[in-house]
Amino acid sequence: MRTSFPMGDISRRSFLKAGVAAGALAATSRWSPADADDPKVLNYLSWPGNADPYLVEQFEKENGVKIRIKEYVGGDQMLAVINQSPPGSFDVVLADAEYMHLLHAADFVEELDPADYPLKDFWPEFQNFPLHWFDGKLYGVMTDFGYLGLSYNTKEFTPKEVASYAALWSDKAKGKVGFFDWYLPSMGSISLSNGNRPPFDIDEAKFEAMKEKLFSLKPQASGFYTIADIFSSLTNGRAQLVPGIGEWITLGLRMNGVPVDTIIPEEGGLQWTESLSIVKGTPKRDLARKFIQYTTSPEGQVKMATKVDNKKSIPSIAGWKLLNQTMPKEAEILRMTLTGPNVMDEYKAKKIQFRQLPKQQEIADWNDAWSEFKSL
């Protein structure tokens, strides 16, 4: 029997509050659902890059359709976009796992039949992934994941020097600490550095202590960056340490000759997890289901893992097997070999905490703290 992850009572009002922080941004790029009723178009709300031909061209050809993507950055923006869009505007949404309970509570995603998807092909740890199940019912299927820790310039810092988040406060790091401008992973890392496990379920005293520690980093900061700016700042050396990001950025840079790596510090790291859901109100439920099946098939999983500019870990053992058979060098680089050390080791060693939304504070409280930090 599957069990749901305890999320508490979350109302539609809570859902709307989560999207307020990005409301203005969403308004400047409002989605126009011109293709909502076109049976040959799958409308897809997702993080950037997930409608790249490398990922979706095969699906489009097999089904005689085109995928139209509306891109967002950060779950708060995703919530704002989907809330402000007429029903039927989107058929599928790729969401971070920590936002699934808000999508479910607001009745924006369909219940899924587990038998429709290859969950038995997944690593056992991910077959009943708690953030995707509510009252024993499935609402999202994991597509990929990765770890967030401390990314660093390998010419300037040794692995020993960055074995703890304490490296962020070192004299050597002054003016060299870059921040991904999203409160959740950045503050989650600082919470871990303060010994909070789990890092997002903390009382007011621990929250205030975490804020104080965060604010003490301002003299160390080189800047607050978008995704594109993170890539460039690590490449040009302006940022030499960045908490709360991971190999989804540093692996691609390293393969292009940039001296960067990511470590999970002794205080632990975070796991980001992406999943696909069917948006309630879609007239193309069957096509949406086929797209999730395609993405979680061994072939779809290998493509998710090996996209040139955004390499990821995948939950499907069948995908791992196909990757090792067809692209063994990539499997080794991605630490997804079936023998020897691999990316599941950190998970099994309990070094990883799920990235989640704040439990004991409002999302706005964390966002406000982040804004205050940036304005110091």
Regions found by a protein language model. Give the residues of each.
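N-terminal secretory signal peptides
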Residues: 1-14, 18-22
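Early extracytoplasmic/lumenal segment of secretory-pathway proteins
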Residues: 37-102
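Extracytoplasmic ligand-binding site segments that recognize negatively charged/polar headgroups
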Residues: 75, 94-235
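Paired acidic/hydrophobic, glycine-rich loop segments that form the ligand-binding mouth/hinge
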Residues: 91-94, 223, 240-245
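Periplasmic-binding protein-like
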Residues: 207-216, 246, 254-280
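Oxyanion-binding "anion nests"
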Residues: 229-249
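Conserved C-terminal helix/tail region of periplasmic/extracytoplasmic solute-binding proteins
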Residues: 232, 342-376
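Mature extracytoplasmic/periplasmic domains
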Residues: 279-348
